[in-house]
Amino acid sequence: MHSLEKVTFEDVAIDFTQEEWDMMDTSKRKLYRDVMLENISHLVSLGYQISKSYIILQLEQGKELWWEGRVFLQDQNPDRESALKKKHMISMHPIIRKDTSTSMTMENSLILEDPFEYNDSGEDCTHSSTITQCLLTHSGKKPCVSKQCGKSLRNLLSPKPRKQIHTKGKSYQCNLCEKAYTNCFYLRRHKMTHTGERPYACHLCGKAFTQCSHLRRHEKTHTGERPYKCHQCGKAFIQSFNLRRHERTHLGQKCYECDKSGKAFSQSSGFRGNKIIHIGEKPPACLLCGKAFSLSSDLR
C-alpha cells in the first residue's frame, strides 16, 4: 500500500468544552481516550502518515498531555497559531507507543458494544476504526449515530451515560465467562480467578493473594495487630467490618431478614447462606477435595 497524505490527530479528534469534560466521569474519559487511541492506530494501518511531532514525543514519555482552558495541538506551526487562541476547550490525547518500524500502534483496543450508523453513507460502524474511515471518507466531521438510542458518538461520550444505559452500567465484560463489571479494575481482579494469578505475596510466609487489601489484612496476623476494639467487652479485631459485626451481638440487631422464611440474621454471610438453600443454588466447592461450603469465604 502506498503512503497516503499526512493527517493530524485533530482531523479525527472529538473536542469537548471545559464544562462538558468536568461533567464526564472516569469511565467516560477512558472511553474517549480508547476511541481516540484506536483512531490513531487505524490511520496508520490505512497508510496515513503520523508526523513525529512534539506531542508524539510527549506521548512516548508518558507525560500529561492536556491542560484546562486550552487546546493542546499536535503540530505547532505558524499556520495553526490562530487555533491556539481557542479557549475553554480540551483535547485528550491517548497514550500510544512506537514499534520497530516507527509506525504508531495502539496500546489498548476497544470494541464499542453499540453499533453505529454513519449519517451520510448509512454504513454500519461497529467499532471506532470504522468510524475513522467514515470520518476520512466524507467531508467534515459528521457524527456516527447509535442505532439503539439515536445518539451520536459525541453524545455517547458526553455527561449522560448512554452507553452504560445499553449495557446496564456494566461495560467491562470477561471474555471467558461473560460476567460484566462497571470498572476495568474489577474486571482485572475477576480475571485472576480464571488464571489463578496472585500477585500480592506475604514476605514472611509466602502466602499470596489476589488483592493488596487481603495481603495487608493477612500481615496483621503475623504482627498480632488488632486495632479495632469493642468498647463494651474489650474484644479486638483486625478489621473494622468484623468489629461492627461483633457489636451487633451486643445490640441484638438482626439486619438481614429472609423474605421467604422470615428468618433474621445479624450477618450478611448467614443471610446469603440461607438464601442459597431456598433457591437451590449449588454451593461453592473445593476444586481439590470436592468439599462444598455454604459460603465462598469459608471455601477460601
Curated annotation (Swiss-Prot):
KRAB domain residues: 7-78
Listed SMART domains: KRAB, ZnF_C2H2
GO cellular component: nucleus
InterPro entries assigned to the protein according to its UniProt record, in alphabetical order: KRAB (IPR001909), KRAB_dom_sf (IPR036051), Znf_C2H2_sf (IPR036236), Znf_C2H2_type (IPR013087)
One Pfam family, short name: zf-C2H2
Compartments in which it is found: Nucleus
Swiss-Prot/TrEMBL keywords: DNA-binding, Metal-binding, Nucleus, Repeat, Transcription, Transcription regulation, Zinc, Zinc-finger
Zinc finger (C2H2-type): 172-194, 200-222, 228-250, 256-278
One GO term (biological process): regulation of transcription by RNA polymerase II
Molecular function terms from GO: DNA-binding transcription factor activity, RNA polymerase II-specific; RNA polymerase II transcription regulatory region sequence-specific DNA binding; zinc ion binding
Family: Belongs to the krueppel C2H2-type zinc-finger protein family.
Function summary: May be involved in transcriptional regulation.
PANTHER family (alphabetical): FI23536P1-RELATED, ZINC FINGER PROTEIN
Name by which UniProt lists this protein: Zinc finger protein 705B
Organism, as annotated: Homo sapiens
Species lineage: Eukaryota, Metazoa, Chordata, Craniata, Vertebrata
